[in-house]
Amino acid sequence: MSAPEVLVVLPTLGDRLDTLRLSIESVNEQRADLEVTLIVVTPLQAVEARALATSLGAVVVDDPKEGISAAINCGLDTRTTEKYYAWVGDDDLIRPGGLAKLRSVIETEPGTVLAFGGCDYIDPEGRTITVSNAGRLATLLLSWGPDLIPHPGTMIKLDALQEIGGFDPSLRYAMDLDAFLKLRKHGSFAWTRTPVSAFRWHPDSLTVANRLASSREAESVKRRHLPRAIRPISGLWHRPVRWASAFAAGRGNARARAL
């Protein structure tokens, strides 16, 4: 058996056992194409989730209870031979062949530090609501518009991620956006429009249930990455982006209810 190439981190509170199983199984399917280390970060009291993860071959790490960014960073700290990082939530999925596809994209050019693919938005029953596959447009909008790079469905070179210090533990919603903006200084981004992941859209998803707080945190992150001279006027475009994001979320909820 060759050394693992991809470190997949899955943080969970352990309260979604049915979808957690599906998420872990979707990662295990990737082992047909490449070697993967799956780290499940979960609290000590999540006994059933820990047992489930262990039975399915994951490495279980204790959640430090300092927020989701700190949990992911704990997973990153377990790195051994892996070159790449990928994330999956406890109700997300990696599509068959998804990690291998992302690896081929990120390895196309030596200066690439991040690769992302399309992401299916699915309802609680797994039916596709819509697909996010913005490609190059996502990179153009990143610093001022909506973040269209899906965290599930992204692969990052671990050396570059460690150079930026991992994920900011003070952030609850936009830690991926902050990392993406920092990573631009370390190399280029590449993409495929092929769906490589699925995000389960339901009312208690962290960013779905807390849309306003998520938008405000994202605006704060984007503002601090702007040139100092234009930060005071960033509200001119951040507010319309917030409105557009809320409108898109409303349409997503409507589509989910209509299925």
Predicted region positions:
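N-proximal low-complexity "stem/linker" segments adjacent to membrane-targeting elements
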Residues: 1-26
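Cell-envelope/extracellular polymer assembly enzymes that use nucleotide-activated donors
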Residues: 4-7, 37, 178
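Short, acidic, metal-binding catalytic loop of nucleotide-sugar glycosyltransferases
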Residues: 24-35
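A conserved acidic beta->alpha catalytic loop
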Residues: 40-50
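Glycine-rich, basic loop-to-helix element that forms the pyrophosphate-binding segment
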Residues: 63-81
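Short beta-strand-to-loop acidic/aromatic patch adjacent to the donor-nucleotide binding site
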Residues: 82-93
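Conserved donor NDP-sugar-binding/catalytic core segment of glycosyltransferases
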Residues: 93, 97-129
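Conserved nucleotide-sugar donor-binding catalytic segment
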Residues: 136-217
